Swiss-Prot record:
Family: Belongs to the neurotoxin 14 (magi-1) family. 07 (Jztx-56) subfamily.
Entry protein name: U26-theraphotoxin-Cg1b
Tissue-by-tissue expression: Expressed by the venom gland.
Broad class of the protein's primary localization: secreted
């Protein structure tokens, strides 16, 4: 009996000490997990900012004035982007020689 009581007390102290260490480890692991989550959250926010910036520059690039087609360039129809003094017209030889109309000065064909 004299040996059993100290062994039980020793096992009780070891168990309490192990639980205390486990709680400390849990807190440390939780802190590490939170810091990793914060780092990944910051990376995610940075990725969103870069994506928004890329979309903004894409809008800026697409907002420039569209280029027009010069003289004697084949065009599809009247809505083709010929330069202002030019119009998309069917010139002489259209159909049997030329396959499409051309951007020409108005009334020259």
């Amino acid at each position: 009996m004299n040996t059993i009581i100290p062994l039980l007390l020793l096992s009780l102290l070891i168990t309490v000490y192990a639980y205390a260490l486990e709680d400390g480890n849990k807190e440390e692991m939780q802190d590490i997990a939170e810091s990793e989550f914060e780092a990944s959250n910051e990376m995610l926010q940075l990725a969103h900012l870069l994506e928004a910036d890329r979309a903004e520059t894409e809008e800026d690039r697409n907002s420039r004035q569209k280029r027009c087609w010069g003289a004697n360039v084949p065009c599809e129809d009247e809505n083709s982007p010929c330069c202002p003094p030019l119009k998309c017209e069917k010139t002489f030889g259209y159909g049997w020689w030329y396959g499409s109309p051309f951007c020409v000065r108005s009334g020259s064909g």
